[in-house]
């Protein structure tokens, strides 16, 4: 049939004039200038121009494909309400949900229950219960117990927050996580109030009391950024008020702080820390043979570089002459054990993917 700007074809059909309803079955095709519908069981009301789907159905437009197995689409208002395995697929991602509302004129969609946002190019999936889709802004907001899974070659990063924002502007792609962010990967974990991940350069930025754990080191600063390369942390940028702590035991902690710090990793292991401005450090000194505690070394130097191997300090390069003092272990007072603003937060570290919800 031809109705207004639509052509509808099928192998079988019937018309109920009293309710203005066409019934189409088997190889149903609806063609319009803006879209095409493919299904095997569809009812069409010629009065209100609403199509009803009963079975697997596709709505294909220029830049996206909408799929469902039950629902309706108002061809006059371009509003759809879809149920059962409903999804929107674009060139960039796939959005799934038990039910899906879509308004073409507002370029807005909403998915409810068992929501999944899948980006196969970046190997990322975000799960949740609600997703809002803003087509013109290329933005999707996922909420209600959302969890993000970022698949690397040998491992997966799991992240939880109250909300995830998935943004794409041309070739630029970002994920923003807001409120009570926690993430877990076997070789590094973190916690902060908000976070952004830029896929262009694999830069992660953490804000508001950020903390990162890797290779036994606790890494903190007012603002913390780190680069991911091949699924591993390659370097961490810290400023202001950075501090890196390595726990020796329940009593002693190796500590480094300064104005700006950059930490470098190799094969998931801390290899080097560059300190720029107001450098301070406390390190426990042990007997190389017996591992007995000899004392605590306290050093001050404006700029310094520390080299590590297997969590042990191997070498320190000072840019200027340092002020250094070693206190015999038996003479150490409690006040001398810690640098100013020392705060061990080991109890907050996620030890499994389940811990990101705690």
Where are these regions (language model features)?
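Mature-chain termini and adjacent capping regions
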Residues: 1-358
């Amino acid at each position: 049939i031809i109705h207004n700007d639509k052509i509808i074809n099928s192998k079988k059909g019937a018309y109920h004039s009293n309710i203005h309803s066409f019934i189409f079955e088997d190889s149903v095709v609806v063609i319009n200038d803006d879209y095409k519908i493919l299904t095997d069981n569809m009812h069409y009301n010629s009065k209100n121009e609403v199509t009803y789907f009963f079975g697997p159905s596709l709505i294909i437009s220029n830049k996206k494909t909408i799929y469902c197995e039950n629902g309706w689409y108002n061809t006059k208002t371009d509003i759809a309400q879809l149920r059962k395995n409903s999804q929107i697929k674009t060139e960039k991602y796939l959005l799934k949900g038990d039910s899906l509302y879509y308004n073409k004129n507002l370029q807005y969609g909403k998915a409810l229950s068992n929501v999944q946002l899948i980006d196969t190019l970046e190997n990322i999936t975000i799960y949740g219960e609600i997703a809002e889709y803003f087509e013109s802004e290329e933005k999707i907001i996922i909420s209600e117990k959302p969890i993000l899974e970022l698949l690397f070659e040998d491992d997966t990063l799991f992240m939880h927050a109250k909300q995830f924002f998935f943004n794409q502007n041309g070739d630029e792609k970002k994920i923003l996580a807001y409120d009570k962010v926690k993430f877990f990967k076997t070789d590094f974990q973190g916690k902060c109030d908000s976070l952004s991940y830029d896929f262009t350069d694999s830069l992660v930025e953490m804000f508001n009391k950020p903390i990162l754990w890797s290779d036994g080191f606790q890494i903190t600063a007012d603002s913390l950024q780190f680069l991911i390369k091949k699924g591993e942390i390659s370097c961490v940028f810290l400023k202001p008020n950075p501090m890196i702590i390595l726990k020796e035991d329940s009593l002693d902690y190796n500590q480094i702080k300064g104005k700006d710090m950059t930490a470098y990793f190799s094969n998931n292991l801390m290899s080097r820390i560059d300190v720029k401005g107001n450098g301070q450090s406390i390190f426990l000194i042990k007997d190389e043979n017996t591992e007995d505690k000899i004392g605590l070394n306290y050093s001050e130097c404006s700029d310094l570089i520390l080299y590590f191997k297997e969590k042990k300090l191997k070498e320190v390069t000072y840019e200027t002459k340092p002020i250094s003092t070693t206190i015999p272990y038996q003479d150490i007072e409690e006040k001398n054990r810690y640098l100013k603003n020392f705060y061990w937060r080991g109890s907050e570290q996620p030890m499994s993917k389940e811990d990101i919800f705690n």
